[in-house]
Design a protein with these regions (language model features):
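Pyridoxal 5′-phosphate
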Residues: 1-411
C-alpha cells in the first residue's frame, strides 16, 4: 500500500524542519523543488567524504572508481528512459538541457525563414532560448494555439505546422496548468511533417514512467531537483544521430580529442562532447539514487497517489467557497488557484503564516498569464510522493479562513 506518511520518514527535512511559523510544515511547492531522501543525501555526502575524485582525469584508483560510478549512473538513467547510455548527457538541469538543444542544434541548423513552434504555456526555459536563437539566426518563433481549457491538441498542432517549421518544443506537463499532453500523438504529427520534437520533461519525468523510444521524441530535458535529486544536475536525452551533428553549447576540458593553434578542434563523440569541464559528480551520484528510489516506489503507484490527491484537493478547495481554480480537470498534481478577491502574493504570504509553502506569481510562464489566464498572478500548490490528505486539509482550512481574514485586513 502506498503510504505517504511512511515515505516522509525517508526525508530528513520532515524530521529537521517539522514546523514553519510555529505551525506544522505543509510542503506544497513540489513543482518548484522537492525534498531529498536519506539515500540521496548519503550518496552526496559519501562523494565528499569518501569518494572525492575527478572523472576521466587520473590514473589512480579513486579516479577509476569514479569513472565506474559515472558509467553506472549513465546506464541507470538510460534504463530509466529506455535509451542508450551514449544518448544521456548530464547537464545542470532542464534549463541547461534546453539551452544545449537551442544553441547546439538551433544555432547551427536554423536559418532565416525557418520556424520554431512553442506554446504560450511554456516555462521561460523553453521560451527564452528560442527567442535568442530567433534573434541570432533570423528564424521565427510561432505558437501552437491552446484549446479553450489550455491543452495542446493534435488538431491545433496540425494547423500550426507550416513548410517552414523545423522544430516543435513543448512541455509534456505544464508547470502552471498541469495538463498531460498527448506527446506520442503530437510527436507523430510533427515527424510526419519532417519536424523535430524537443520535450520539456521537468514536470513529467519525476511523476510518471517515461519511455523515450515509445514517445519517439528527438530530445528530452529534465532536472534532478524536481525528482528528489540534488540541485544543479539534470539530463538531456537526444537521439544519437542528432547529438552527433550538434556543436557543444560549452567547450573546455574533457569534450575534445585535439585542438591546434590554427583554431581547429576535433570534439569527442556524444555524450562527452556536451560535458566539458568537471561535472557535478556528487549530483550525478545523488540523481542515480533518486531514480532508484522512485522506481522502488513504482510510477503506477505514484500516478495513482497524485491523481487521488488532486481530486481530493479540488473537492476540498471548492467546498471553501473562497477558491477560484484554473485547472480543476488537469491530470498532474498541480492546482493553480486564487483566493477570491485576494492578490496571489498576499494569499501565499497568509498561507505561509499558517505553515503552508505554496508558490505565487506567474511561475516563469509570463505568456500564459498575459493570454490564457488573463490574471496578473496565481497561487500554485503542487504535490508529490510524501504529500498527504492532511496537507490538503490544512490548505483548504487556510483558504477557507484566509478569504475572510484577508478581506478584513485589506478592506
Amino acid at each position: 500500500m502506498f503510504d505517504p506518511k511512511a515515505i516522509q520518514n525517508d526525508f530528513p527535512m520532515f524530521r529537521n524542519k517539522p514546523d514553519m511559523q510555529g505551525r506544522p510544515l505543509v510542503w506544497l511547492d513540489n513543482a518548484s523543488t522537492t525534498f531529498k531522501s536519506d539515500s540521496v543525501i548519503s550518496a552526496v555526502v559519501d562523494y565528499y567524504t569518501k569518494e572525492t575524485s575527478n572523472s576521466h582525469r587520473g590514473d589512480y584508483d579513486l579516479c577509476y572508481e569514479m569513472d565506474q560510478a559515472v558509467l553506472h549512473a549513465r546506464k541507470t538513467i538510460a534504463r530509466f528512459l529506455n535509451c542508450e547510455p551514449r544518448e544521456v548527457v548530464f547537464t545542470s538541469g532542464a534549463t541547461g538541457s534546453l539551452n544545449t538543444v537551442a544553441y547546439g542544434y538551433g544555432l547551427k541548423f536554423l536559418k532565416e525563414g525557418d520556424e520554431i513552434l512553442i506554446t504560450e504555456a511554456e516555462h521561460a526555459s523553453n521560451v527564452l532560448p528560442w527567442f535568442q536563437i530567433a534573434k541570432y539566426t533570423g528564424c521565427k518563433v510561432s505558437y501552437i494555439p491552446l484549446s479553450e481549457n489550455g491543452r495542446i491538441t493534435p488538431k491545433n498542432l496540425e494547423k500550426a505546422l507550416t513548410p517552414r517549421t523545423k522544430l516543435v518544443s513543448f512541455a509534456a506537463v505544464g508547470n502552471v496548468l498541469g495538463y498531460l499532453e498527448p506527446v506520442k500523438e503530437l510527436t507523430k504529427i510533427a515527424h510526419n511533417h519532417g519536424v523535430l520534437v524537443c520535450l520539456d520533461g521537468a514536470q513529467s519525468v519525476p511523476h510518471m514512467k517515461t519511455d523515450v523510444r515509445d514517445l519517439d521524441v528527438d530530445f528530452l530535458a529534465f532536472s534532478g531537483h524536481k525528482m528528489l535529486g540534488p540541485t544543479g544536475i539534470g539530463v538531456l536525452y537526444g537521439k544519437y544521430d542528432l547529438l552527433s551533428k550538434m556543436d557543444p553549447f560549452i567547450s573546455g576540458g574533457g569534450n575534445n580529442d585535439k585542438f591546434h593553434m590554427d583554431c581547429s578542434v576535433t570534439f569527442l563523440p556524444p555524450p562527452e562532447r556536451f560535458e566539458a569541464g568537471t561535472q557535478n559528480l556528487a549530483g550525478i551520484l545523488g540523481l542515480t539514487k533518486a531514480v532508484e528510489y522512485l522506481e522502488n516506489l513504482g510510477f503506477d503507484s505514484i500516478v495513482e497517489h497524485e491523481r487521488k490527491l488532486k481530486q481530493y484537493a479540488v473537492e476540498k478547495l471548492l467546498q471553501t467557497g473562497n477558491a477560484e481554480i484554473y485547472n480543476a480537470d488537469s491530470e498532474a498534481g498541480i492546482i493553480t488557484f486564487n483566493i477570491k478577491g485576494v492578490f496571489a502574493q498576499d494569499a501565499a504570504t497568509y498561507l505561509n503564516s499558517q505553515g503552508i509553502a505554496c508558490r505565487s506569481g506567474q511561475h516563469c510562464a509570463k505568456l500564459l498569464n498575459q493570454t490564457y489566464l488573463k490574471t496578473p498572478a496565481t497561487v500554485r500548490a503542487s504535490f508529490y510522493v510524501y504529500t498527504t490528505e492532511d496537507d490538503i486539509d490544512a490548505l483548504a482550512e487556510a483558504v477557507k479562513n484566509g478569504g475572510n481574514y484577508l478581506d478584513a485586513y485589506f478592506i
